[in-house]
């Protein structure tokens, strides 16, 4: 059967023994960890445009708010040269819990940070941070060793060089950590357009793929035109009754 005719799919809420979303990220088991997205560290990022990096991080924060995912942030020496966290995170995810550190490079070395993660009761961690090769990799490796499922969002993270980023991704793969992208996370968590908040998801796609915003605008305009035509026809029919 085709989707148009109502085939069984994840959109129906019907489970399948093979596929059907079971291998994808489960929102109900997920925590978003945003690590050291700080003004000073941004200045040495070379493997991605910082403007796009910030947009991807902001999108993840907005996505977490939309889907009611726990968000945990932390920063490395924010009063020193690393600088403050990017304000867009707090603006986009006001429910985020911030865990201060006492100089630990690896957030997983901070007992309060680990305790905060464990207290969510969730076992899937989506991590992003600056630098990828340090601030993401170190806690990702430790969390994986502690039994968590870990995803590293590479384009919501940044490194001083392409080489640093590539070697980090290789190490992730060796350790069983899943390298992913902001748009992949967005799609995995959304799953279907058949939902009441679909318009909000369309806005998020525009952040990670700016040209997609034009697609959404075009579709919205087409819907408005179609709705207006229907209303005109209904009014004409009513007038002749």
Where are these regions (language model features)?
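Active-site acidic carboxylates
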Residues: 2-103, 149, 166-170, 177, ...
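Short acidic/histidine-rich motifs immediately flanking catalytic phosphotransfer sites
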Residues: 29, 121-123
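Well-ordered alpha-helical segments embedded in enzymatic catalytic cores
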Residues: 56-59, 112, 135
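Acidic, metal-coordinating catalytic cores used for nucleic-acid/nucleotide bond scission
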Residues: 78-80, 104-107, 132-136, 161
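A short acidic, amphipathic alpha-helical/loop segment
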Residues: 85-88, 112, 138-142
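Glycine-rich oxoanion-binding loops at beta->alpha junctions
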Residues: 98-119
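A contiguous pocket-lining binding segment that forms or flanks enzyme active sites
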Residues: 124-182
